[in-house]
Amino acid sequence: MDVNPTLLFLKVPAQNAISTTFPYTGDPPYSHGTGTGYTMDTVNRTHQYSERGRWTKNTETGAPQLNPIDGPLPEDNEPSGYAQTDCVLEAMAFLEESHPGIFENSCIETMEIVQQTRVDKLTQGRQTYDWTLNRNQPAATALANTIEVFRSNGLMANESGRLIDFLKDVMESMDKEEMEITTHFQRKRRVRDNVTKKMVTQRTIGKKKQRLNKSSYLIRALTLNTMTKDAERGKLKRRAIATPGMQIRGFVYFVETLARSICEKLEQSGLPVGGNEKKAKLANVVRKMMTNSQDTEISFTITGDNTKWNENQNPRMFLAMITYITRNQPEWFRNILSIAPIMFSNKMARLGKGYMFESKSMKLRTQIPAEMIANIDLKYFNDSTRKKIEKIRPLLIDGTASLSPGMMMGMFNMLSTVLGVSILNLGQKRYTKTTYWWDGLQSSDDFALIVNAPNHAGIQAGVDRFYRTCKLLGINMSKKKSYINRTGTFEFTSFFYRYGFVANFSMELPSFGVSGINESADMSIGVTVIKNNMINNDLGPATAQMALQLFIKDYRYTYRCHRGDTQIQTRRSFEINKLWEQTRSKAGLLVSDGGPNLYNIRNLHIPEVCLKWELMDEDYQGRLCNPLNPFVSHKEIESVNNAVVMPAHGPAKNMEYDAVATTHSWVPKRNRSILNTSQRGILEDEQMYQRCCNLFEKFFPSSSYRRPVGISSMVEAMVSRARIDARIDFESGRIKKEDFTEIMKICSTIEELRRQK
C-alpha cells in the first residue's frame, strides 16, 4: 500500500516538522594539511576591512600595525572595522543609564574573583601555544613549562599559586632584556634491537638552553598559534582558529570574567547561560515586544547575521570599553584588565606549519616552513597563493604575521556580546525619540532584532537606523544573509522560535548510540542522553521507549554481550553462557554480563548497578564491586562524570552522567608508541602535574570556601590545611588519637624534607 507522506503530519503542528529537515547525516568534514593558507586569508581579510586606517610601527618588535579606530565613516555596505570611540563610549554610558550600577557591581564581583583565582585555572583548556617550545601542547604542560622558565629567570611571584601573582611575573618578563629558555630537540640513532636483532631508529630527546632577546621574547609572548577549525558543517571552505599562549590567557580570563558578570545582568544576552535557561530568557524578550505591539503597532523580527564579526572587532575598542566600565575602580584592577586588549592590539599570528610541496616527476615531498615564506621565490606558487604571500609579506617577522586589528575566533565572546547588547539597548523609545523602537537578543556574533512601529515605513526606518548604528561600532549586519519575518518566527543560535521555541530533536541524533568509553560509562551515558532528551527536547514516551530498545540492542552488539540464554554466537558467548548458568538470580546480571535489560522510561535516572543491586547473587556483587581486582585499572571515581556529547552542529556539549565504579569501568591503557618519542618526557611531566593538581584539589576542593590565603607554596598550603582539618576531626571525635598523631608526624616530616632540599 502506498502511503501519502503528508498524512503523517495531519495531527502535527507545522513547526514540529522541523526535525524531518535534518541534513546532517554522515561525518562532518575534517581538515588535512596545514592551516597556513587559511591563516593568511584571515590576516589579509582583516587588514582589508581596516585598510583606510593609520599605519604605525611597534617600537619594541618593529611590527607594522594598522589602526582603523576613528577611521573614515563607511560610504557603502562593504564590511569595515572603523569603530568610533566616542560612539562606543556613549553606547556604554546609555547601557549603564538603563541598568543603574551594573558596571560597578560587576567590577566588585570580579575583583573578588581576581584575588582568589589560583593559577591552576589556566590548566583547563585543550591545546595551548607553548612559547618555550614554539608549538602546541596540552594546557597543563604549557603552563608548567612557562612557570619553569620564569623561575629559572628569577621571576618568583608565581610561587604563591595565585593567578594574579603569575600575571605579575608575565608583566615583569616583558621588561627583561633577555629570557633564557630550555628547548627540546631530537637526536636519531640507528641501534640493533636486542630481541629481534634488527636495526631500529632510536629517538632521544635532548634539552638545550637558548637565549631570547627582548624583541624575540615579546613576539613569542604576543603570538597566537593558528589551526584549522575541524568538523564545521555547511561550509565549502575551512577557516582558521587561534590558540593563545600562557602570557595572554590569564589576562583574557579576567576580562571575560568581568564581561560574563555583566552579561548575566543583561536580559538581551544569550551568554553565559545555555539550554532551557537561555530559551526562557529569550522568550521573555519576545513576549515583551509582542505584548506591546498588539493593538496599534506591527512587529517584525530579523534573524540576523553579521559579516566577519571577529575580523571587524578591534581590541582598541575593547580597551575603551574596559576603561569606561572600570572608571571608578582601583588602579591595580584597571591596569590588570587593560592588559589583555593592549596585548591583542599588538598580537602576532603564527602562520602554522607552512606549505607542502610535491614534485610529481621526482616523487619528492618537502615542507616549506612558515619562516621561509618571507623570502622564498614566488615562482613555485600558484596565482592565488602568490597574491596572498605578496600581500602578507610586509607584515612578517620570524614566521609570524603582525595582526593588530581584528580579534581571532572565540577570544572575547562575552565582551563582544556586551558591545552588541549596548546597541540593542539604544532601541528604547526614549533613545530613538520617534515612533519606531527595537529590542533583541545577542550571543557573541549571532543576533535577533525585533522592531516595532506603527507601519511598514517605520519598520524600515528602524532597521536602517539599527544598521547604521552598528556600523559606527564596527559591527556589520549582513543585508544578504539576514532575513525579516513577522515576529513569532525566527532563528537564534540554532534555536527555532515559532510561537515558542521548537524542539529540534533531530539535532541530538548523533549523540544517541554507544560512546565507546567502557561498558559502565557507555550504559550510563546512553540512558542519560535519552533521559535528557525527554526533559529538554520533546522526546515522547513511545519514541523514548523505542530509542531505549535500539540502544540496548546496539550496546549488546558493540560489547558482544547478548543475553545468556540467547542462541547468538559471539566471541564472548562461551563465558557469558557459563556465567548465566552459574547465576541463581539471573535478573541481577548487568546487561554487559549477558543479563536482561531492566531499564524503562521510568527508571532511566538510576545507574544500572543500583537498579539491580538487590537482585544480584552475593558472590557476583563481590566480584563486580571489587576495587582490588587486578585486571581493572581504575580511574579515581567521582560520583558524577562528564562525557562529551556531539550534537549535529554547534559545539560539543558536556553532559554529566552518574558513574558507579565497578570492574566494568576499565580504562584503556595509553598507546605505547608515544613512550618511544620525544613526547615521553612531556607525558611524564603532564602526569606528574596532573597528580599534583588533583592532590591540591583534594585539600582545597573547588566547593570549599576556605581558600588558601597569603603567600605560600602549594605544599605549605596543603600541610597547613591538613593540620587544621586533622585538629578539627580529632576534637570532634571523627578520628582517633593515633591517627591524629600520625598525621602530625607526616606533616613535620614533609616540612623537614623541604628544609633539607
Swiss-Prot record:
Please give the Pfam families that the UniProt record associates with this protein: Flu_PB1
Q: What EC number(s) has UniProt assigned to this enzyme?
A: 2.7.7.48
Where are the residues of the annotated region Promoter-binding site? 249-256
Q: What is its main location?
A: host cell
Annotated region Disordered: the residues are: 50-82
Q: Which Gene Ontology MF annotations are present?
A: nucleotide binding; RNA binding; RNA-directed RNA polymerase activity
Catalysed conversion reaction = RNA(n) + a ribonucleoside 5'-triphosphate = RNA(n+1) + diphosphate
Q: What does this protein do?
A: RNA-dependent RNA polymerase which is responsible for replication and transcription of virus RNA segments. The transcription of viral mRNAs occurs by a unique mechanism called cap-snatching. 5' methylated caps of cellular mRNAs are cleaved after 10-13 nucleotides by PA. In turn, these short capped RNAs are used as primers by PB1 for transcription of viral mRNAs. During virus replication, PB1 initiates RNA synthesis and copy vRNA into complementary RNA (cRNA) which in turn serves as a template for the production of more vRNAs.
Subunit comment:
Influenza RNA polymerase is composed of three subunits: PB1, PB2 and PA. Interacts (via N-terminus) with PA (via C-terminus). Interacts (via C-terminus) with PB2 (via N-terminus); this interaction is essential for transcription initiation. Interacts (via C-terminus) with human PKP2 (via N-terminus); the interaction competitively inhibits the interaction between the RNA polymerase subunits PB1 and PB2.
Q: What is this protein called?
A: RNA-directed RNA polymerase catalytic subunit
**What gene does the UniProt entry assign to this protein?**
PB1
